[in-house]
Every structure is written in C-alpha cells, then in structure tokens.
C-alpha cells in the first residue's frame, strides 16, 4: 500500500452558528486555518484547502503557506460532501485524510496514527472513519479516491450527509480514542462560547 500523502481541510461553510468564517477564527493570535495547515505540512506532502468560492480563496491566499493548494468547490452549495468530491478529484495519491477547519487542536499523534491505519487498511477499505461514543467522525476520516463516483451519485440524489456516504461504502471503523487518547483532535468550535478553552 502506498503512503497517505494527501490531506484536505474543508473550509467552505459560512459558519452561521459561529457568526463568521470558522477558518479565520483566532487561537493564540493565529487563524485556525494557519494553525491546522502548519501542522499538516509537517506530515503530508500534498496539503489542500477546499473553499466555497474565489472570494473566500482570495482571503485565504494571503494567510496560507505557498505549499498549500487552494481549491474551490466544483459543486457549489453541496456542503462538506461537495468539498470531499472536489478534493478527491485533485489529490496526488489514492486517498486523502479530511479534516474540518474548526479543529485546530488536531494532534501529531492523531495524524501519525491515521497514516498508519491507512498503511494497514487502505487496500481493503474505502474509508477509515474514527468512531467515538457519539458515533462516527466522518470529517476526520480518510476517503479513497475510488469513492468519488459514489459521492457524485449521492449528491445527484440531493443526499448531502457525509454519514450517508460512510454507510454507502466499505468503511472501516477505528476507535477515536486509539487515534488520539486526548480526543482533542476531534474538538470542534461551532459557537462563540466554544472558544473559551
């Protein structure tokens, strides 16, 4: 099995509950997207950020390291599943790890463990999905490029839940706590009060 070299950060949402673009929220005076991509560049040779449109891309271009590839949604308005579709059509390898832009606490241990899971399971799984007490973490998962057609079929039927994708393909479940014993990698910031850490 080849190495997992691609990672895509999904950042196309409007952040309605938060009241602003979540990738631009600050932690220690740095935007979430800068924190996340800086960490990812230490582990992956192909780092992508998927944004909703060219206006958002213009804003992010001034923040991101030049090694980060910026993509805009090929299927605007399709939510995270549309971002997965876009990224899978542009990755350099056979699969990519996906992360949301509102998870700046992702750990090195999580990234190393996901790459190891891909080495062990990538040939036999269409997706490698962390599973916690509350169920799947489908936006912290590895998806094979071979599921892009399934994503397109789901979107053509107006099925936009990423959970529907993992139910439709051969998904391997991995205990989230085994990937990151602190579970900090899975901590999302959805509302202003979540920023009080």
Swiss-Prot record:
Source organism per UniProt: Methanothermobacter thermautotrophicus (strain ATCC 29096 / DSM 1053 / JCM 10044 / NBRC 100330 / Delta H)
Protein's recorded name: Probable molybdenum cofactor guanylyltransferase
Binding site for Mg(2+): 102
Family: Belongs to the MobA family.
Compartments where located: Cytoplasm
One GO term describing the cellular component: cytoplasm
Molecular function GO labels: GTP binding; metal ion binding; molybdenum cofactor guanylyltransferase activity
Enzyme nomenclature, EC number: 2.7.7.77
GO biological process, one term: Mo-molybdopterin cofactor biosynthetic process
Reactions listed under catalytic activity: Mo-molybdopterin + GTP + H(+) = Mo-molybdopterin guanine dinucleotide + diphosphate
Top-level enzyme category: transferase
Keyword Oxidoreductase tagged: no
Known cofactor(s): Mg(2+)
PANTHER family, alphabetized: MOLYBDENUM COFACTOR GUANYLYLTRANSFERASE
Source species, domain of life: Archaea
Annotated CDD domains: MobA (cd02503)
Binding site for GTP: 10-12, 22, 73, 102
Gene it is expressed from: mobA
Lineage, opening ranks: Archaea, Methanobacteriati, Methanobacteriota, Methanomada group, Methanobacteria
Keywords, alphabetical: Cytoplasm, GTP-binding, Magnesium, Metal-binding, Molybdenum cofactor biosynthesis, Nucleotide-binding, Transferase
Function of the molecule: Transfers a GMP moiety from GTP to Mo-molybdopterin (Mo-MPT) cofactor (Moco or molybdenum cofactor) to form Mo-molybdopterin guanine dinucleotide (Mo-MGD) cofactor.
Gene3D superfamilies in the cross-refs: Spore Coat Polysaccharide Biosynthesis Protein SpsA, Chain A
Pfam families: NTP_transf_3
Cleaved signal peptide residues: none
InterPro entries found in the cross-reference section: MobA-like_NTP_Trfase, Molybde_CF_guanTrfase, Nucleotide-diphossugar_trans
Residues spanning the membrane: none
Domain-related comment: The N-terminal domain determines nucleotide recognition and specific binding, while the C-terminal domain determines the specific binding to the target protein.
